[in-house]
Amino acid sequence: MYAVLATGGKQYRVQEGDVIYVEKLNADVDSTVELNEVLAVGTEEGIKVGAPVVEGAKVVAKVAAQGKAKKVVVFKYKSKKDYRRKNGHRQPYTKLVIEKIEA
């Protein structure tokens, strides 16, 4: 069984036991979160596609870690004008372990 869920403006195809990195969620490490925005659920019988979400479906995941991704460097310049700007940031993420898919 698999599910397609949406969180943080992105979509993820997950199965039980998968590890995914999503945009930061406000949850403590080792707590469980319920992701209710399930767009599709696939089983042996077929696929259930929501409009826009599947009614009564949810994905239960455990928060494994909170962290920051590698630094993204943004460098702007204008040629021949001695204009240089270097910025960077580290995007916060949440590491989730998918425990259960309920449909």
UniProtKB/Swiss-Prot annotation:
Carries keyword Ligase?
no
Per its UniProt record, what InterPro entries does this chain match? bL21-like, bL21-like_sf, Ribosomal_bL21, Ribosomal_bL21_CS
UniProt-listed SUPFAM superfamilies: L21p-like
* GO molecular function annotations of the record: rRNA binding; structural constituent of ribosome
Q: GO BP, one example?
A: translation
Name of the protein: Large ribosomal subunit protein bL21
May I have one GO cellular component term? cytoplasm
Q: Which cysteines are joined by disulfide bonds?
A: none
Quaternary structure and interacting proteins, as annotated: Part of the 50S ribosomal subunit. Contacts protein L20.
Family according to the record? Belongs to the bacterial ribosomal protein bL21 family.
Q: Give the protein's biological function.
A: This protein binds to 23S rRNA in the presence of protein L20.
Keyword annotations from UniProtKB, A to Z: Ribonucleoprotein, Ribosomal protein, RNA-binding, rRNA-binding
PANTHER family associated with the record:
50S RIBOSOMAL PROTEIN L21, LARGE RIBOSOMAL SUBUNIT PROTEIN BL21M
The source's superkingdom equals: Bacteria
